[in-house]
Amino acid sequence: MNQKTSLLARIANGSLVLQIISGIILGVILASISTTGANNVAFLGSLFVGALKAIAPILVFVLVASSIANQKKNSQTNMRPIIGLYLLGTFVAALTAVLFSFAFPTTLLLTTGIEGTNPPQGISEVINTLLFKIVDNPVNALLTGNYIGILVWGAGLGITMHHASDSTKRMLSDVSDAVSNIVRFVIRLAPIGIFGLVAATFAETGFDALAGYGQLLMVLVGSMLFIALVINPIIVYVKIKRNPYPLVFKCLRESGVTAFFTRSSAANIPVNMALCEELKLHKDTYSVSIPLGATINMGGAAITITVLTLAAAHTLGIQVDFMTALLLSVIASVSACGASGVAGGSLLLIPLACSLFGISNDVAMQVVAVGFIIGVIQDSAETALNSSTDVIFTAAACEAAEAKEAKQAAQVS
């Protein structure tokens, strides 16, 4: 009995990253040996993603409410610079996608579209959807995972409870801690869940279906890697004035890997919260910035929209000048920030961007169909970039603020 307890303790206290890597390797091996066996363990992945999606809304709600209610007077949350980084990162990602698309022009084999999809008819519809998400019923927001509504209601409750009695605010803080402990337990199950996700992905799709879209995937993934490994580190360096790569690699390893396989920014919110706690960031800051980042920090989505739209333009022989490409970057950035307000996310915002070039909705929906075909890679890479960048920018803004405060304190003394 003691040996079993000791083994479980070693597993529970072992390196989560190494365990996740082991789960990935075992999932690939199982899928290559037995497709049936891989399909049989697919439920492990579904359970893990389901658990994350179930706990994430209540986690965000209580953390936001608790952090605002218990916020000390004159304390800084650093939200303004973080939002600035989110918007800058999304726009630069779209611009990078334009440059990659011009450097490596890609054409598509367009055949049939996707039936039963309803893309937004314009940017006003995206904004309209987002506004109605803000005034969503709080219970419905929690049930459906509407993080815009959850943020608004959590912030509203926190503000109104800011002047409540200390015992009430302490109770809210205790509930927040209890939910956080449940999240830690769920995250420890990540190796098992990712094992099931990897096995199911390889068994169901493999990579044969992606062979015909090699160049498109190279442009998409290449743009995302360039943002993750070059642009984001430059932005972070400007903020913190030191080597950014230890922070960048840690976030990619501990947030990006999980997000790559769950393919859900919402499901990765608890993972990012735990990483922020490990990095010893200010709780009042990350409890708001992480769920907000899952909503508006969409560099990966901006890349997807831009690359596929320009691929459609190249396929149809449409000449794209610099100013039009710049306008596309702006449209892709704004659209990407609204991707969480559209069922189907970034792919169904492609027709909106295609309309800039006069591309018909029928052709645009064929481009969306291509997006669904390569989704096993595109969606995974997009989510990994989006989610890991949330932590990177939050950490950079927090560290820059701390350095500024330390400098001011030194000048005063």
Curated annotation (Swiss-Prot):
Key words, A-Z: Amino-acid transport, Cell inner membrane, Cell membrane, Membrane, Symport, Transmembrane, Transmembrane helix, Transport
Protein task: Involved in the import of serine and threonine into the cell, with the concomitant import of sodium (symport system).
One Pfam family, short name: SDF
Family label: Belongs to the dicarboxylate/amino acid:cation symporter (DAACS) (TC 2.A.23) family.
Identification of the protein by name: Serine/threonine transporter SstT
Alphabetized PANTHER family for the sequence: PROTON/GLUTAMATE-ASPARTATE SYMPORTER (PTHR42865), SERINE_THREONINE TRANSPORTER SSTT (PTHR42865:SF8)
Predominant localisation class: membrane
UniProt membrane topology term: Multi-pass membrane protein
GO biological process: serine transport; threonine transport
GO cellular-component term (any): plasma membrane
